[in-house]
Amino acid sequence: RIVATNALRQAKNGHEFIQKAAEILPKHIEIIAGREEARLIYLGVSHTMVNSGRRLVIDIGGGSTELIIGEEFEPIHTESLQMGCVAFTKAFFVDGEINQKSFDKAVVAARKELSGIANTYKEAGWDTVVGSSGTIKACRQITVNMGWSNEKEELTRDGLDKLKEKLLKYKHVAE
């Protein structure tokens, strides 16, 4: 099975891409819905976990973010929200400019996007949170490299706050 996610769901030339890809790939590319993407992410993550219990899996992609609550190999709540790192960079950090106002606008937009699922997810609860995306892994590695957490420590709110403070000292992503 070959699947395409948010990039092709949103692309204006997605079907053209699929036609070209069909010429070289052995199978048809299936553009999957966001919730199916979330389900597959959860299954992939759950097969790498040794602990049991209810978990929240977060995957921040370029165009979307998937949030999944599940137990063992069974996803219970699956959501795909339109708030990926590339989409938010283009929308709120125009021309690579970094400032508090842009951060604030991005946070407001993220909260608005999350508002539709917040109560359901809070009521469901979870024991652990797992980040599965390159975005989360990069944030984690930066906090370790900067000495804001150690190799065994999780990515914390404190570490993320320090990362934000550090980013705000720069005026542009090129710095």
Model-derived regions: residue spans:
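A generic, well-ordered mixed alpha/beta core segment in the N-terminal half of proteins
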Residues: 56-64, 68
